Design a protein with these regions (language model features):
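Bacterial Sec-dependent N-terminal signal peptides
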Residues: 1-26
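Carbohydrate-active catalytic/glycan-binding domains of CAZyme proteins
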Residues: 21-379
Length: 379
């Protein structure tokens, strides 16, 4: 009787358990605990051979090693209309497994007012990328006076449920203005006409926008142009509301000219890094903050075996780190220690390890953990 009752109960629970498993496995977003390293995307200079996407990695957010011996990992001639790209910005999508990158389609030797396009790239492995060129003058009517298209970036807009691309444009006789448009579903083109995202109260130029979302607020870091050049911040709770609160002070911690702000959160910490290019001095500065308002220089803690220009940093998993370092090894990476714990990603408990003499392999069995009510539905 007891066995019959157990079989009946188990049969009744099977559909519910299957549903629970589907719920678990559909959640593809990567938890912060699964990140073990950082990927730095950057370019290196103003020669056409240096205007290309490069990779570097770090396991602590402070010491970085260039991959592929600081040579490009993507061929600019293949993806761009000019033969060069600058200002790479990389974003992990909401699904946790897709990556978007946007770059300025430009060769600086052609002049700072020479480019009209950006490149949209998409990848699921950080190695293989598909790309699309968006030329503003060809894509939209009435763009005859457009002079330049600079430093695109991407962010997910939760209100629209879409990915917003924002960048600066300048027209003859006007100021540089940060515009936005939403990407299409395939991330190959823009939807609708570009609209102004942010115009400072003084109506003067601003470029190199970098948006960070923290505590329900979007923080826009941007470079002022022509009036005490530097990095300022404006905040809003809604990206397209037009309601921005500007902070009056400059955020760079140097009297030298800077550009290309990039901000990222340190894994497992309530700390953020604001980095920028001290471009007139050939330096790159890192600063640290907990509130995105007050910053301190941490240059003495930062080490790189390369010199980056404008770039961005995202956290990556162990599998992603292994994939890109296997593809583009570096001679100097022998000095980098890759964390080996945890050995299983996700929440696990009660592990047991067995060795099979038949297969000559070790097997680890664990119960799942981390579910509401101390629940676990599979092992």
């Amino acid at each position: 009787m007891k066995n019959k009752f157990f079989i009946t109960l188990f049969a009744c629970l099977l559909p519910w358990m299957a549903g629970a498993q589907q719920t678990i496995f559909k959640q593809n977003n990567v938890a912060e605990k699964d990140y073990i390293a950082y990927l730095f995307t950057y370019f290196t200079g103003n020669h056409i051979s240096e205007e290309a996407v490069c990779y570097a990695v770090s396991t602590d957010g402070y010491t970085y090693w260039a991959l592929n011996d600081n040579k490009p990992v993507i061929d600019s001639k293949i993806i761009s209309s000019t033969g060069g790209v600058r200002d790479p910005h990389i974003l992990r999508c909401e699904d946790g497994k897709t990556f978007y990158m946007v770059v300025t389609d430009m060769v600086s030797d052609n002049g700072w007012d020479s480019n009209r396009a950006m490149v949209l790239l998409k990848s699921t492995d950080l190695v293989n990328w598909t790309s699309s060129i968006v030329n503003m003058q060809k894509r939209y009517a009435g763009q005859e006076k457009l002079k330049r298209v600079w430093a695109p970036q991407t962010i997910f807009d939760p209100e629209a449920g879409k990915y917003m691309i924002y960048w600066s444009m300048q027209y003859n006789g006007g100021a540089d203005v940060i515009y936005y448009a939403y990407a299409n579903r395939d991330f190959t083109d823009l939807e609708g006409e570009p609209k102004p995202l942010f115009i400072p109260e003084n109506k003067k130029s601003c470029i190199d926008g970098d948006i960070v979302f923290k505590d329900g607020i979007f923080h826009l870091f941007y470079k002022t142009e022509g009036h005490g050049n530097g990095i300022k911040v404006a905040t809003t709770r809604s990206l397209t509301s037009g309601q921005w609160e500007e902070q009056p002070d400059y955020k760079q911690q140097t009297p030298e000219a800077v550009e290309g702000a990039g901000t990222f959160k340190l894994i497992g910490q309530n700390k953020y890094i604001l980095m920028y290019d001290v471009y007139m001095k050939g330096k790159y500065q890192f600063t640290e903050t907990t509130d995105l308002k007050n910053f301190k220089v941490i240059d003495s803690e930062v080490k790189m075996n390369f010199h980056p220009r404008h770039g961005t940093i995202i956290p990556i998993t162990r599998a992603e780190l292994k994939r890109i370092t296997d593809k583009w090894p570096s001679k100097e990476m022998g000095n980098m220690t890759i964390p080996n714990n945890p050995v299983l990603q996700g929440f696990h408990a009660d592990p047991e390890i067995l060795y099979s003499h038949q297969t000559k392999k070790y097997y680890i069995y664990s119960t799942t953990d981390g579910q509401p009510g101390w629940g676990g539905w599979y092992f």
